[in-house]
Swiss-Prot record:
InterPro entries: NADH_Ub_cplx-1_asu_su-2 (IPR016464), Ribosomal_mL43/mS25/NADH_DH (IPR007741), Thioredoxin-like_sf (IPR036249)
Keywords noted in UniProt: Disulfide bond, Electron transport, Membrane, Mitochondrion, Mitochondrion inner membrane, Respiratory chain, Transport
Protein known as: NADH dehydrogenase [ubiquinone] 1 alpha subcomplex subunit 2
Source organism superkingdom: Eukaryota
GO cellular component, one term: plastid
Disulfide topology: C19-C53
Family statement drawn from the similarity comment of this UniProt entry: Belongs to the complex I NDUFA2 subunit family.
Organism of provenance: Arabidopsis thaliana (Mouse-ear cress)
Subunit structure: Complex I is composed of at least 49 different subunits.
PANTHER family (UniProt xref): NADH DEHYDROGENASE [UBIQUINONE] 1 ALPHA SUBCOMPLEX SUBUNIT 2, NADH-UBIQUINONE OXIDOREDUCTASE B8 SUBUNIT
Gene3D superfamilies from the UniProt entry: Glutaredoxin
SUPFAM superfamilies: Thioredoxin-like
Length: 97
């Protein structure tokens, strides 16, 4: 998982939107609890924003150079699938660099 340390090379910002209580956001909450500290320590200058909003569908947004943004809907994904979605966002940003 060497890609985890290079997130800040391809992304300018990572935003995760989730609901504090909905079952649809449960895997996303678990992902944040298990991975935030590690991701932030590997990418200390990358803004990683966790946005909680009642009733929102879980989503992950990546912002790249020139204001380009990509979104992945996390509804129905498991924690490993969310990690894979993040990896895909990182790799798609690296190909644009």
């Amino acid at each position: 998982m060497a890609w985890r340390g290079s997130i800040s090379k391809s992304m300018k910002e990572l935003r995760i939107l989730l609901c504090q209580s909905s079952p649809a956001s449960a895997p996303t909450r678990t992902f944040v609890e298990k991975n935030y500290k590690d991701l932030k320590s590997l990418n200390p200058k990358l803004p990683i924003l966790i946005r909680e909003c009642s009733g929102v569908q879980p989503q992950m947004w990546a912002r790249y150079d020139m204001g380009v943004e990509r979104c992945v809907n996390l509804d129905g994904l498991t924690e490993p699938q969310i990690l894979k979605a993040l990896e895909n966002l990182v790799k798609s940003g690296a190909t644009k660099a």
